[in-house]
């Protein structure tokens, strides 16, 4: 009779269990399908079903019914797959059931039972989004403890590597795994397990191929020069053997666009490589990372450099070099940020010779590949800023070491004359340094700074600098140097070196002889001496330009003008002078008027002379002949409005074809003083005197006979009817 009063959800669950006590039971197919339909169509029933499954599984565990426990675990997996949208309702009950099974010593040593638990774990992880459960601390702790218990049972109780790797693979499939801080340790443990099992199955990746001693720059591993034709290194994405769960687990952790998950995996990889430094393993993993995210590997490598031991620092630097010199493609690498970090660590560890030298090797390897245009130029500029402009002369030995290393692998022309002059005293291979100069001649300002820098160099470096300048920039160096040494006319190594190479460049034997005499006597060339060599256009094609430089007053010159057809320049050769725009008393610049406005102002000032007061009075007092027009009655205020408007209309009519009237909103007319404005106004009055018959005020006739007939506003006046339609009353 008790069965008649059993709730429906319990009936449906019980009907899924086949009878008997055999251990290999399977849930009934049709009953299970109906149960899934029942819980899907009635969401409130899910909680009741999960609660009843907890109660029934507890009873089955106590009675050691392994067959029923197997059926329960399969039902859990099916419910998760079919009701994953409402997983938050039953997930805690399901984890509680599996935890009870794993803690029961009668069942946790059964591979079949643990395998069924792994299937439930897989179903949960496939549909679990970390961003949705990150706020439920109770569930996060419950799930973390369950996963830890699963790995413990699979590894220690069963010693089943595949079950362990399957658990790692399942856990890695959680969406937004990296956003859950509580699970980061578990995720890192999964990566470590997968790496260890991978190395056990593939011994080639388990040997230490990098030692912690300093590797000379000439060692084969670090001196490898990449060619244009490269063979792609096999990576995680190239492996087709899906039966190896260690590779599948590593692939899900590293072949992902989720940077948080990738960062967790890379932290575990770095820790693993410090224990067994194998560059092949590093390249294998990195080649499976999406190419646009591989730069993260280098960033995470350099981050712990400052806090690591000397042994680990050397290992990290060598691993970075091995990756930079490998065939693994990397894009988007922030080269300057990496360089700054390396230099900072190098300065902090300047007392360790091995670390300093290894960092120099890594800096060199950083420039073996081109990640963006102007990369080499930026790296040289950064070295100059860190060591030269920072004013720390006790670090110049480090600068020389880094500079020599960087120059040895740089082949593109990326240096300007400024950096060339700065680097020359510190470089060992000065010939290679000169090959890095830009082929285009720089601006004369750069030349002036270059010649100023040359004056501080040794005699040998001065000779190299001047000769290199003439070899690369020829006429630009000749004329710029001439302009500089005319103003700085004093004996020096640079002075004589310039004139020596200038005479060779011009091919003037007498000039060369005089240079040697002047050098011997510590004498200088006068302008008259130099004009002799720039006087004949037949023997010196630069004679005209040279004379301009020699004859100009350099105290206020704007620079020399060099023909660009003769010498190719990237920027004009003349030394620019800063021209300050005209300003008002408050410092705001005045905008000049356009040519049209200038014409208007000029023409408006060329009218008739200014009328006197008597003429104006006669003009106002004149009366129109009443026989030609009808009269209207109006007040004096109306008359004044009509008069003003008529002035404007007549001016536009008569002068519109002759004078371009400027829009005051377009250009500001400057330069008109009070007197000019008065003349302009009076000229307008003059123009009105020649209006047609529509004008209210007639021309002046017999002005001497009339006086001032001013009338008050309340008096009546006569207004011409011809103004009808042109009155704008306000």
Curated annotation (Swiss-Prot):
<protein>
    <recommendedName>
        <fullName>Protein EFR3</fullName>
    </recommendedName>
</protein>
<dbReference type="GO" id="GO:0005886">
    <property type="term" value="C:plasma membrane"/>
</dbReference>
<dbReference type="InterPro" id="IPR049150">
    <property type="entry name" value="EFR3_HEAT-like_rpt"/>
</dbReference>
<dbReference type="InterPro" id="IPR039786">
    <property type="entry name" value="EFR3"/>
</dbReference>
<dbReference type="Pfam" id="PF21072">
    <property type="entry name" value="EFR3"/>
</dbReference>
<dbReference type="GO" id="GO:0072659">
    <property type="term" value="P:protein localization to plasma membrane"/>
</dbReference>
<comment type="similarity">
    <text>Belongs to the EFR3 family.</text>
</comment>
């Amino acid at each position: 009779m008790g069965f008649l009063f059993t709730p429906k959800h319990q009936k449906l669950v019980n009907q899924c269990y086949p009878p008997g006590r055999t251990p290999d039971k399977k849930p009934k197919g049709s009953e299970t399908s109906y149960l899934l339909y029942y819980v899907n169509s009635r969401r409130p029933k899910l909680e009741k079903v999960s609660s009843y499954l907890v109660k029934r599984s507890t009873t089955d565990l106590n009675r050691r019914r392994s067959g029923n426990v197997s059926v329960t675990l399969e039902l859990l997996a099916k419910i998760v797959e079919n009701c994953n949208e409402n997983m938050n309702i039953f997930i805690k009950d399901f984890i509680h059931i599996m935890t009870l099974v794993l803690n029961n010593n009668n069942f946790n040593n059964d591979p079949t039972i643990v395998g069924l638990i792994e299937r439930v774990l897989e179903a949960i992880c496939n549909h679990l989004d970390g961003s949705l459960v990150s706020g439920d601390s109770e569930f996060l702790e419950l799930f973390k403890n369950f996963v830890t218990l699963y790995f413990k049972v699979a590894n220690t109780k069963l010693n089943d590597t595949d079950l362990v790797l399957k658990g790692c693979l399942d856990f890695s499939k959680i969406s937004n795994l990296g956003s859950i801080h509580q699970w980061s340790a578990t995720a890192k443990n999964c990566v470590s397990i997968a790496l260890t099992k991978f190395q056990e199955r593939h011994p080639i990746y388990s040997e230490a191929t990098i030692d912690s001693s300093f590797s000379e720059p000439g060692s084969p591993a670090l001196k490898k020069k990449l060619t244009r034709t490269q063979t792609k290194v096999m990576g995680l994405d190239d492996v087709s053997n899906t039966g190896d769960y260690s590779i599948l687990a590593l692939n899900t952790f590293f072949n992902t666009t989720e940077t948080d998950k990738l960062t967790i995996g890379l932290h575990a990889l770095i820790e693993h490589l410090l224990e067994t430094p194998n560059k092949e393993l590093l390249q294998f993993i990195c080649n499976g990372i999406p190419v646009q995210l591989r730069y993260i590997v280098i960033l995470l490598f350099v981050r712990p450099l400052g806090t690591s031991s000397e042994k680990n620092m050397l290992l990290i630097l060598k691993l970075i070099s091995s990756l930079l010199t490998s065939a693994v493609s990397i894009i988007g690498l922030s080269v300057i940020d990496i360089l700054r970090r390396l230099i900072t660590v190098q300065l902090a560890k300047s007392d360790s010779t091995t670390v300093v030298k290894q960092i120099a090797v890594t800096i060199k390897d950083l420039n073996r590949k081109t990640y963006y245009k102007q990369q080499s130029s930026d790296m040289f500029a950064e070295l100059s800023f860190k060591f030269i402009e920072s004013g720390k002369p006790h670090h110049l030995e480090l600068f020389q070491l880094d500079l020599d290393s960087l120059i040895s692998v740089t082949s593109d022309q990326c240096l300007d004359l400024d950096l060339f002059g700065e680097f020359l005293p510190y470089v060992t291979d000065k010939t290679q340094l000169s090959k890095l100069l830009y082929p285009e001649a720089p601006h004369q300002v750069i030349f002036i700074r270059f010649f100023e820098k040359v004056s501080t160099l040794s005699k040998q470096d001065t000779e190299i600098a001047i000769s290199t300048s003439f070899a690369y920039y020829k006429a630009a160096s000749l004329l710029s140097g001439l302009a500089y040494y005319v103003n700085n006319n004093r004996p020096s190594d640079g002075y004589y070196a310039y004139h020596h190479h200038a005479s060779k460049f011009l091919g003037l034997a007498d000039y060369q002889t005089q240079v040697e005499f002047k050098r011997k006597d510590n004498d200088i060339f006068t302008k008259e001496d130099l004009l002799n060599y720039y006087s004949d256009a037949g023997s010196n094609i630069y004679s005209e330009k040279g004379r301009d430089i020699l004859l100009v007053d350099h105290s206020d010159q704007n620079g020399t003008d060099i023909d660009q057809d003769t010498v190719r320049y990237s920027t004009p050769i003349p030394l620019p002078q800063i021209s300050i725009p005209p300003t008002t008393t408050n410092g705001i610049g005045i905008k000049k008027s356009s040519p049209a406005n200038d014409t208007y102002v000029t023409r408006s000032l060329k009218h008739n002379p200014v009328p006197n007061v008597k003429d104006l009075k006669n003009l106002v007092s004149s009366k129109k002949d009443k026989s030609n027009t009808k009269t209207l009655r109006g007040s004096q205020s109306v008359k004044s409005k009509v008069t003003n408007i008529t002035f404007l209309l007549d001016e536009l009519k008569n002068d519109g074809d002759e004078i371009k009237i400027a829009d005051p909103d377009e250009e500001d007319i400057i330069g008109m003083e009070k007197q000019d404005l008065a003349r302009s106004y009076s000229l307008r009055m003059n123009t009105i005197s020649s209006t047609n018959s529509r004008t209210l005020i007639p021309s002046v006739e017999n002005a001497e006979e009339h006086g001032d007939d001013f009338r008050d506003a309340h008096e009546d006046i006569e207004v011409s009817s011809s103004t009808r339609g042109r009155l704008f009353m306000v």
